[in-house]
Amino acid sequence: MLRIAIFGCGYWAAFQVAAWQVQGAEVVALWNRTREKADAFAEKFHIPHVFDTPEEVFDWGEFDIADIITDAPAHEELTLLAASRGKDVICQKPMAPTLEACVRMVEACKKAGVWYAVHENFRFQPPTLAFIDAVKSGVIGKVLHAEITMRSPDLAIMEKQPALKVMPHMVLRDMGPHIFDVARAAFGEMKSMYAVPVYSYEGIDVPDAAICTLRADNGAVVTCNLVHEWNDRFMAQGEKGRIVLDHDNVLHITTDKGESVIDTKTWNYLPYIPQADWELHGGHIMYSIPICIDALMKAYKEGVPAATNGADNLETIRLVFAAIESFDTGRAVEI
């Protein structure tokens, strides 16, 4: 059985730890900055060992993977610590607050020979997986234009995660890793970025929405919209047809041979997730967490890089910081 040590027990950690346990891993150790919170979390999830410092977790060392679920500013230090102790590591997104830190993390894990992945769950939503598979099948030929629309943090989400209200370039740092990862998974690498920020709420001085236009290496124009939609909507226009994932999570594939319609709502309610959180984020998002965990576990057990391995996710992070540069300069940025 895979043994996991958890670092951090904030809002998303509860869903992630439950997913590990449901998927058959054993969560054996926990560290959090606040010991009282760690003790309560460990009792709730039956985690046998709680430590006062990260170093103590690694000194104990009876685990396979360090799962880092802290706030982003702590990711680099903990990842480098794991690499220095020869421990495989999974890091929550975003990988780190700066591109330079992300590069150091990837290089340190590569040098140490440890398995390194990023917990990037959005590409594992059932509707998103169906859309990516349809695009990659070649049924519509070469993609000419695509549009990806995802929900950005609105007031309800910011109340759950108040740090978002003061996070510089908030919408890009919070949702950029998700939407750009999906764009890359579906349409390949990108070579340019133009991003426009949107400020929706009086008294909140960080951007909560964004419109980003990217040019893919293969020539496709990909528009990434981070707006206050409830459900995602994706579209790809190709030389031979069109693929649309609509607001009801129904996939429409239209070619000269006709239209195929596929209902991608394949998830069921997960009873370990509070109903309020399920309704706030949507079942498609919450269900992606155990799917992502399962994909990470399979890759790890097979001894192969995860789809969201550190080196791959670094390319997504480059897009995030290109978008930030475009925000700040008002100009398109070459990747």
Residue ranges and their predicted role:
Residues 1-45:
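N-terminal Rossmann-like dinucleotide-binding module
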Residues 6, 34, 45-108:
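Beta-loop-alpha module in the N-terminal Rossmann-like domain of NAD(P)-dependent dehydrogenases
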Residues 121, 240-311, 335:
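C-terminal glycine/acidic-rich active-site capping loop/insertion
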